[in-house]
A protein has these predicted regions:
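Membrane-proximal, proline-rich intrinsically disordered regions
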Residues: 14-68, 127
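Short coil/linker segments at helix-helix boundaries
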Residues: 154-194
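Short amphipathic alpha-helical interaction/hinge segments
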Residues: 19, 52, 152-159
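Acidic helix-start/capping segments at beta-turn-to-alpha-helix junctions
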Residues: 64-70, 136, 142-143, 165, ...
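Hydrophobic-face positions in mid-chain alpha helices that act as interaction patches
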Residues: 53-74, 87-88, 177-178, 184-187
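Conserved, well-structured interaction surfaces
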Residues: 82-157
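Generic structural "secondary-structure junction" signal
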Residues: 18, 22, 32, 92, ...
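Sec-dependent bacterial lipoprotein signal peptides
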Residues: 1-13
Length: 194
């Protein structure tokens, strides 16, 4: 039995071939392929129309939905009551807060959009990039600036006479917006970003 076990161990084992993952691309693969970097470029405007990004709710249909949310929250749009409305939380300023999906949708959508731009920026080395790739890089920086500007509009705490600028953690958040997460920030650091 011992001899059979030894022969089986030698015959049935072998070297493992290392393969690259096929369900995702590495940073090296993205930066070395012109088609891959072009795909990252087109991912940015495509994300603006992304459907069911966060939770699959009927309001989860991309940037246009965020524009609609801002319109109904700021009385820029007449609200018609039909008894069935996917935007009622924002229209009535109800169920808005850290424990509600309506708030989390906006936050998560913006950060996934930032991640999409950071993927493009991180895939291009400006020192060795072609002229076309530098154009892609410029587009990514533009999209990221656009998203951060929108986040500032949505999340900056402004002085008012109804709500204290001191949050539940005891921090004064007057005139603060959101943390800046660039392509160089690690996931661990991003999760710890004040």
């Amino acid at each position: 039995i011992l001899g059979l076990s030894c022969v089986s161990a030698v015959v049935l084992t072998g070297c493992i071939d290392e393969t690259l993952p096929t369900h995702q691309a590495t940073d090296e693969q993205l930066s070395s392929s012109s088609k891959a970097t072009e795909a990252l470029l087109w991912a940015m405007p495509a994300f603006a129309n992304n459907y069911k990004t966060v939770d699959g709710g009927d309001y989860d249909w991309g940037y246009g939905s965020l524009m609609h949310i801002r319109d109904v929250m700021t009385d820029e749009m007449v609200i018609i009551e039909s008894g069935y409305d996917h935007y009622s939380a924002w229209e009535h300023n109800q169920y808005i807060g850290p424990n509600y999906l309506s708030t989390q949708f906006i936050w998560n959508y913006f950060w996934k959009f930032v991640q999409t731009t950071n993927n493009m920026i991180g895939a291009i080395n400006p020192e060795s990039a072609s002229e076309t790739q530098l154009g892609y890089l410029g587009a990514a920086y533009g999209y990221r600036a656009f998203i951060y500007l929108d986040m500032a509009r949505m999340f900056e705490f402004l002085e008012n006479d109804g709500t204290s600028p001191t949050n539940s953690s005891g921090n004064n958040v007057l005139n603060l917006t959101v943390p800046i997460v660039t392509e160089e920030v690690t996931e661990e650091a991003a999760r710890n970003n004040p």
